[in-house]
Amino acid sequence: MTVEMKVERGLFDEVMVPCYNPMEMIPVKGQGSRIWDQNGNEYIDFAGGIAVSCLGHCHPVMVNALTEQAGKLWHLSNVMTNEPALRLAKKLTEVSFAERVFFANSGAEANEAALKLARRYAADVYGPEKSEIIAFKQGFHGRTFFTVTVGGQAAYSDGFGPKPGDVTHLPYNDIEALQAHISDRTCAVMMEPLQGEGGIIPPTAEFIQAVRELCDKHNALLVFDEVQTGNGRTGEFYAYQGLGVTPDILSTAKSLGGGFPIGAMLTTAKLAEHLKVGTHGSTYGGNPLACAVAEAVVTEVSKPETLQGVKEREQWFREGLAKLNEKYQIFAEIRGKGLLLGAALNEQWKGRARDVLVAAGKEGLLVLVAGANVVRFTPSLVITKQEIEEGFAKLDKAIASLV
């Protein structure tokens, strides 16, 4: 019998690279939208692992998919293909515009592949001078050196030496700035169809349409980073489907695996031809375990009743936040769509989003922040009404403790 080593939060500071600052409690069990720590304390989960746990913790369809595949085949590499990867790729083409799929292990890797494809396509078709990538301030696209540079937040990208070049950042939702800058040198515009880390900022209908039209005018590719917005999060399987425009390349991850690491880049057959054998790859991309779980997730999330349920739950959250605001006058506005929501703090509470997060944790509720002024909610897409009501009761107590 194996004797497990006793683990406490202090061990983190002894053995881990200090680029995270985790909570003091250590979760050991999860079920639905509840988790329990080492001491048996229960928490309602409104964070969902930062928009990852789309079916909650330990959902039966995911557990069954993982355990069944674990008894068959774990890994091959891409010297061979495998059945779960092919089935998942087929499903992703059925629920999106895409005709071709590249599998990776994370959102950052999916975005890296998207950017490399955009540059490769432009160089092949128009020449090496067509290399500019336009992205938006306060965007977030991952932590590789390329993707963190394209993300428009200097706090994440500064301090690592010379950055990859030919990347321009413009204000989000600013049509005039984009019109003034985009040119025939632009190979791609990369954007989140709803900015997540930047504060849950939705695009205006006019802006999203203008981006598509300007990309077409200048033969630039439109790349949508749907790492956070995808897989049912906004009430559509992918957010672009509710915006009236279609990207040329789309990245997806986070809730694609429901908690099992996987990412994917989706694109057209025409563009995919430019990543020939050997031009890109991933040892773990398309891993049978990851793809088996993701296939189960996509099947469950793409059901009409699941997507409709997201819209219903959005209303429950908005009603709960409105009641709290009526009581405490804390929020300036509620932003977002589906179950990617941000409660922007008003002037009186400015800069206190983390205070709310910490207070909520003490009451047994997990929430997120999106900058210093926005409390972010990205719960399971199938969270129950009872769990939501319990969570808001805890959030009420948390805010009361701060007044």
Swiss-Prot record:
N(2)-acetyl-L-ornithine binds at residues 143, 282. The modification N6-(pyridoxal phosphate)lysine is found at residue 254. Pyridoxal 5'-phosphate binds at residues 107-108, 140, 225-228, 283. One of its GO terms (cellular component) is cytoplasm. InterPro entries: Ac/SucOrn_transaminase_bac, AcOrn/SuccOrn_fam, Aminotrans_3, Aminotrans_3_PPA_site, Class-III_PLP-dep_AT, PyrdxlP-dep_Trfase, PyrdxlP-dep_Trfase_major, PyrdxlP-dep_Trfase_small. GO terms for molecular function: identical protein binding; N2-acetyl-L-ornithine:2-oxoglutarate 5-aminotransferase activity; pyridoxal phosphate binding. Binds 1 pyridoxal phosphate per subunit. It is found in: Cytoplasm. Keywords: Amino-acid biosynthesis, Aminotransferase, Arginine biosynthesis, Cytoplasm, Pyridoxal phosphate, Transferase. It catalyses: N(2)-acetyl-L-ornithine + 2-oxoglutarate = N-acetyl-L-glutamate 5-semialdehyde + L-glutamate. GO terms for biological process: L-arginine biosynthetic process. Its EC number is 2.6.1.11. Homodimer. PANTHER family: AMINOTRANSFERASE CLASS III, SUCCINYLORNITHINE TRANSAMINASE. May also have succinyldiaminopimelate aminotransferase activity, thus carrying out the corresponding step in lysine biosynthesis. This is Acetylornithine aminotransferase. It comes from Vibrio vulnificus (strain CMCP6). The gene is argD.
